Amino acid sequence: MKKYSGRAVVNGVSITIAHRSIVGLLGRNGAGKTTTFRMIMGMIIPTAGQVVFEGNDITELPMYKRARLGIGYLSQEPSIFQRLSVRDNLYAILETMAVTKQHRDSRADELIERFGLTEVAGSEGRFLSGGERRKLEIARAMVTEPSLILLDEPFSGVDPITVQELQSDIRHLVASGVSILITDHNVERTLEVVDKAYIIDHGKVLAEGTPAQVIQNEIVRKAYLGNSFNGDEFD
């Protein structure tokens, strides 16, 4: 639960992110989705209730301590260093870790290759396309090898082909053992990649289930998707 001035903007929301799964957190503006997401990431402390990660109560922990436990975060806002190269953006994180230079070099090479950034590895952040920037941001979030990554609007501001590439990257992350929570206004693209979705409305979970289940839910269509939403590909 989260209250502001006595008003509950989130009330009784319970979300489970299974190991190696992709979960979507969706809802209209003002529904409580963003507040819920920020309580999970540690930006907002709940008024009541718990945030539990791998059996540990992390409700009161700040973001940096959650990161140490294995929670990565991709901000909606640009977060790369504009005047550093792709490789140096990765090194900026790697150099905060107590690892050898050999490990830093091999980890940077691995991430650059994994996210298809080899051709732009020497380019400064300010010269990257929107899709390249987004891939670098995800690569940076993976530097510390988190077991859970929170993706805030990963499909925002990128072209359809890059969205498909990002969806593929996300699936590969899960195949490697990472769990993912996504919140994004691009409902269709999000539902294409998630295993399970939670629909938040008026601060509560309106519905949960597979993409096909939430799309076929008449209450969800009325409150969130609208009657014009097709969704035939999810049948």
Where are these regions (language model features)?
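Conserved ABC transporter NBD signature motif
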Residues: 49-56, 69, 107
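Conserved ABC ATPase "signature" region
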Residues: 91, 102-120, 168-171
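Conserved catalytic motifs of ABC-family nucleotide-binding domains
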Residues: 145
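Catalytic Walker B motif of ABC-type/P-loop ATPase nucleotide-binding domains
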Residues: 149-153
